[in-house]
């Protein structure tokens, strides 16, 4: 009877066969990525496939951090590593040690991926660009402390304005440490707040040599800067992420200095030109005002001003006399109307009635009695006459008109 093996035995045996295979121990495979998953641990799990087959792959975090691009489903790649068996599931898979795009370079893909990402976030939008000051007091320069770049910037700066202050923040401009140093330099210049504009500069080079200026950390530090930033990386045909996010791009470091530093000779020439134009404009204005003043002086009023004043004074006197006459007439009419009203009121006075022989009767409460219904027998009444007062007691009351 044949020997009976466990599943683990067979899987382990197959693993040993595969692991000892000289081809499978170091292999590069071309395929299209599918089912890509970037685990929170940093590991990458995916499948590469062609028209007829597929192969499961895993890339652990220690290798994944070295990738210059972000793998995506549908991307054609060349994956290098070794084939082994995952004993638990009995599946063979490729353990990837490196990966690169098939055809287009990894750096180029990484560049396009980051560019698209930052563009979606609005880091390149024109409305977010800050204006470069016309007359900066000092300029910060983020570049290497040695080489042609800093010399060119210094030469151009002092040729255009010998009194301009330059603040150099030296950094590495290529290599693994460069991106972090550049971002930190921009941050520090903002914290110190002693410069009015920042130039981030580097000379020409390959995509790999310029790569620090394509790193996301540099792009975000430029975007977060409160101080305007001019990018001057590489030659005129070189474009970096730094160029897109900066407030202004210069084709070369020398051009950046020309954009940041105003030419004092040109400024003085413009100032003199403005001064001459202002004097000319002021002279024309004075001449115009003199002509207007002469025309005014030629008018009769200004030629004989006292005659005009006397005429107005006579007019004022006439108006005053007219107003006095009108007021006197109005007062006279009002006095007459008042006298007539006083006469009417006097005729209606109770005292006038008493003078004509009539009398006035009041009850004990002091009210005038004008009908017998207000009187009761026994009431004491006051009778007012023109020449005195009489008090009487009511002994009888009769209703009816006694004079009919």
From Swiss-Prot:
Report the record's Gene Ontology biological process terms.
DNA catabolic process
Q: Please give one Pfam family short name.
A: tRNA_anti_2
- Chief place where the protein resides: cytoplasm
Localisation per UniProt entry: Cytoplasm
Q: What's its EC? A: 3.1.11.6
Spell out the reaction equation it catalyses. Answer: Exonucleolytic cleavage in either 5'- to 3'- or 3'- to 5'-direction to yield nucleoside 5'-phosphates
Q: Which domain of life is it from?
A: Bacteria
> Where is it found, in Gene Ontology cellular component terms?
cytoplasm; exodeoxyribonuclease VII complex
If you read the UniProt record, what top EC class would you report for this enzyme, in one word? hydrolase
- Which GO MF terms does the UniProt record name? exodeoxyribonuclease VII activity; nucleic acid binding
Q: Which keywords fit this entry according to its UniProt record?
A: Cytoplasm, Exonuclease, Hydrolase, Nuclease
InterPro entries named among the record's database cross-references: Exonuc_VII_L, Exonuc_VII_lsu_C, OB-fold_nuc-bd_dom, Succinyl-CoA_synth-like
Q: What's the stated role of this polypeptide?
A: Bidirectionally degrades single-stranded DNA into large acid-insoluble oligonucleotides, which are then degraded further into small acid-soluble oligonucleotides.
Q: Which family does it belong to?
A: Belongs to the XseA family.
Task: Provide the assembly information.
Answer: Heterooligomer composed of large and small subunits.
Protein name (database record)? Exodeoxyribonuclease 7 large subunit
Q: Native species of this protein?
A: Ruminiclostridium cellulolyticum (strain ATCC 35319 / DSM 5812 / JCM 6584 / H10)
User: What gene is behind this protein?
Assistant: xseA
